[in-house]
Curated annotation (Swiss-Prot):
S-adenosyl-L-methionine binds at T85, T86, E104, F105, D129, A130, D149, V150, A151, Q152. HAMAP family: RNA_methyltransf_FlpA. It comes from the Archaea. The lineage of its organism: Archaea, Methanobacteriati, Methanobacteriota, Thermococci, Thermococcales. Transmembrane segments: none annotated. The gene is flpA. One of its GO terms (molecular function) is rRNA methyltransferase activity. It comes from Thermococcus onnurineus (strain NA1). The keyword Methyltransferase applies. This is Fibrillarin-like rRNA/tRNA 2'-O-methyltransferase. It is an enzyme of class 2 (transferase).
Amino acid sequence: MKIKKHKFPGVYVFIDEDGSEKIATKNLVPGQKVYGERLIKFEGEEYRVWNPRRSKLGAAILNGLKHFPIKPGSTVLYLGVASGTTASHVSDIVGWEGKVFGVEFSPRVLRELVPIVEERRNIVPILGDATKPEGYRALVPKVDVIFEDVAQPTQAKILIDNAKVFLKSGGYGMISVKSRSIDVTKEPEQVFKEVEKELATYFEVVERLSLEPYEKDHALFVVRKP
């Protein structure tokens, strides 16, 4: 068993006893599990194994993502934070110097995040509607990165609208697109091309990556605000 640094700062490669490689983050709150993930102790540090079947971002990294703008110290706006599975790994990466502002529409789901953020003080939970960024404008500063995981037909527009309000010039957006949430009648490839075209009206599209086999009919886009 061994842990080594990944090419992305704050991400680690965990080599299991059977030789298989997984990804992990250094646990910001040692002893805390967020979603039943495996905790690994190695050379005096504790790491959390990042499950790609529970996290679109984890799936993207394992699939060979080339651009990962979330770094130690980053300020991140997370749209569709849900109960915090992926956000907790982002929290590990950005560390105490960084901040994760997590917007969630469902009060019931956001309540599940409360016990996590009591110890992870770098996550700020916000009850809000990602389609209406003005509603949480007073709570969120300018950010380095926006990550969006909102399964809605207008998800590209949601990223653009939030970037106009919150994203620094030169900052990055990351969006997980589920083709069936946009149009079930079209082939996923057609949907992804249309999303890319819409994103390109405002951003420079830096990368597009399939999330198969972890997520069916999903792609992750990385974009940059000029």
